[in-house]
């Protein structure tokens, strides 16, 4: 709501930086105080951030790359705290597949630093690391499976409805039906 109001009030340029910062702050708060809500919030960010970017770009002009799109990976990477907290016991608790994946991603990142640009390596790291961290976070907290399952089902039900309605509206109003 704040993002939409800020966009229509003409503060789109300011929201380009405030949206990722605000999302990160809310993500930290939820991670520490309400871990189950953090999971839903993270998914909702992945669902609606492209729409938020479109609204901001509509008001303030298109910008590529857009800092708005950093919000979901930044909030997802908060799960790195789970990795550092459980790293000493990860191997003995069945975390070997995750540790192998993390090792592979960091190996690829180091190769990209040597063979190509730093920016390209960081972008690839930003693509590969958040899903691994999120998966590790979920696997370490398996004891909360029932609560996570309920939250994920509710999040995805509403996410499918909202994104489906938006996709249908966009298809019908942009003239794509005439193609």
Each predicted region: which residue ranges?
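Juxtamembrane transmembrane-helix termini
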Residues: 56, 83-89, 114, 140-146, ...
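Aromatic-anchored transmembrane helix interface
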Residues: 63-77, 95-109, 116-140, 160
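Membrane-interfacial loop-to-transmembrane alpha-helix junctions, especially the N-terminal start
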Residues: 30-44, 87-101, 148-156
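Cytoplasmic juxtamembrane interface segments
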Residues: 135-153
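N-terminal signal-anchor transmembrane segment
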Residues: 1-85, 106-111
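Alpha-helical transmembrane segments of integral membrane proteins, especially early/N-terminal helices
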Residues: 27-35, 86-93, 162-176
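Membrane-interfacial helix-loop-helix modules of multi-pass inner-membrane proteins that assemble, modify
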Residues: 53-55, 109-119, 162-179
